[in-house]
């Protein structure tokens, strides 16, 4: 909200957001210029090294919870987890609050995390764990009149894919806390 106010009042020209966290409808006077080239959209299953078959998986995401229960581990116990990435990894590795969690690969990469003591990282194929709409994409939010000015900074392939994913989400009446996964690759 703070960034949007800064844009509308002319104190900022561009606001940078994680696309998956944006509402499907922009506030009046604002628009999306598009998206920077998308990072790998897969989720990563992060499990303790000493666990062969997880009994408790921690995630705050309704989408991840629904997919894990429906396809991978229907009998596992799900637990809420909060905090930044480092905190979540410590809660699994050190505090043993759960056997595993699921995190976005793009987030781990942007933080420079490819390993963590006591944990193994297993990227999940997109067809097994469908990402959130806009996952791994960075959105550029601007004032409505500035679309042409900033559109050239955006990646057309990512913009086409994420616009489609967000349209599907909007059609379903969803937001970032809904158990909806959608991912577009290539031309339709």
Regions found by a protein language model. Give the residues of each.
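Glycine-rich loop at the start of a catalytic domain that most often binds anionic cofactors/ligands
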Residues: 1, 27-29, 116
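N-terminal hydrophobic or amphipathic helices and topogenic motifs
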Residues: 1-18, 182-188
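Residues within well-ordered alpha-helices
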Residues: 2-3, 21, 64, 88
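Alpha-to-beta junction loops
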Residues: 8-17, 21, 94-106
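Short connector loops at helix/strand junctions that flank enzyme active sites
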Residues: 9-11, 27, 40, 135
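Conserved beta-strand termini and adjacent loop/short-helix elements that scaffold enzyme active sites
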Residues: 17, 35, 60, 81, ...
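A conserved helix-loop-strand patch within extracytoplasmic ligand-binding domains
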Residues: 19-76
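Small-molecule-sensing regulatory modules
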Residues: 67, 71-188
């Amino acid at each position: 909200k703070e960034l949007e106010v800064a844009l509308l009042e002319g104190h900022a020209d561009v606001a940078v957001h994680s696309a998956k966290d944006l509402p499907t409808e922009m506030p009046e006077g604002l628009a999306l210029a598009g998206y920077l080239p998308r990072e790998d959209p897969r989720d990563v299953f992060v499990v303790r090294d000493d666990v062969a078959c997880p009994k408790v998986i921690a995630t705050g995401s309704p989408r991840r919870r629904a997919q894990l229960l429906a396809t991978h581990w229907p009998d596992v116990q799900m637990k809420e987890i909060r905090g930044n990435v480092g905190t979540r990894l410590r809660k699994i590795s050190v505090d043993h609050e759960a056997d595993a969690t699921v995190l976005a690969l793009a987030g781990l990469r942007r933080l420079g995390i490819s390993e963590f003591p006591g944990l193994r990282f297993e990227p999940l194929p997109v067809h097994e764990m469908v990402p959130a709409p806009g996952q791994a994409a960075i959105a550029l939010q601007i004032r409505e009149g500035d679309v042409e000015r900033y559109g050239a900074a955006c990646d057309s392939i990512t913009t086409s894919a994420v616009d489609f994913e967000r349209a599907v989400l909007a059609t379903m009446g969803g937001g970032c806390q809904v158990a909806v996964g959608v991912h577009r690759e290539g031309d339709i």
